[in-house]
Structure formats: structure tokens, C-alpha cells
Amino acid sequence: MNLLKSKGVALLGLVALASTGALGSEGDVDYRHYSMEAIGGHMQAIVKILRQEVPHNEQLSLHANAIADMARIAPDLFPKGSQGREALPAIWEQPEDFAEHLDAFHSAAEAFKKAAASGDAATIGSAIGGLGQSCKGCHDSYREE
């Protein structure tokens, strides 16, 4: 019975912390960080494939699809109260401009996804350039290095 009571007290404590935002904010910051690292990992894998450093051309679309999926959820990675790590305060101070950058990222990711599926080298090359520029544009304004 004591074990059950202590688990109940611990659960109530977690609920109380979550309702004050103490867990949510830190959790959101970590979630955003790892999500962005995942995007970066897919980009690095794509570069290896395009430079023919690895024999995995058939996996290009897999990585392109993953980035497009992550771009779709990118706005959810920056809820109010989740300031921290590399995210600059300008994200929440200039929400309209930041949203435009996220829209550009999503559009570029979708274009690269289509290009990767086409298999056309010129289209892929152009689309990866656009995707890289969309990442850079946002990072230059909204990410602390």
C-alpha cells in the first residue's frame, strides 16, 4: 500500500509540474533540439548520397520524405514558452516573419521530395540547393550558433 501511495504522490507531483509549465517548456526545447538534429542527420545522409560517397541512391527518397514530414511539423516545434538552446527570442518576437521562413522550408522540402522521386539529377541538384537555402535563411535569423 505504501508503494501505491508513493507512486500516486509522485504522479500528482508530475501533473502539478506539467501544469505549471516546468516540464513542458524543457521537454519542448529538448524535443525541438532532437527533431532539428534528425533533419540535419537526413541532410548529411543526402549529401553523402549526392556526392556518391555511399552507394545508397535508392534511399534518397526516404531521406527526402523524412525531411518533408519534419518540415510539416516544424511550426509545432516552437510553442510559446519554449525559448532556449539555439532558438533566438526573435522567433517569438517576430512570429509572422518566422512563419514565412517555416513556410519556405516546407515548400523547399516538398520540392526536394518531388525531385528525389523523379530521379532527375538536374532537378535534384536544384531542389537540394533550394532546401539548403531555406535552412540557412532561417538559421541566419533565428538560430544562435
What is the role of each PLM region?
Residues 1-11:
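Bacterial N-terminal signal peptides that target proteins for export
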Residues 6-8, 33, 140:
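Hydrophobic alpha-helical segments, especially transmembrane helices
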Residues 17-21:
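N-terminal signal peptide c-region/cleavage motif recognized by signal peptidases
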Residues 25-130:
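Extracytoplasmic c-type cytochrome modules immediately beyond a signal peptide or single-pass transmembrane anchor
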Residues 131-143:
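The canonical Cys-X-X-Cys-His
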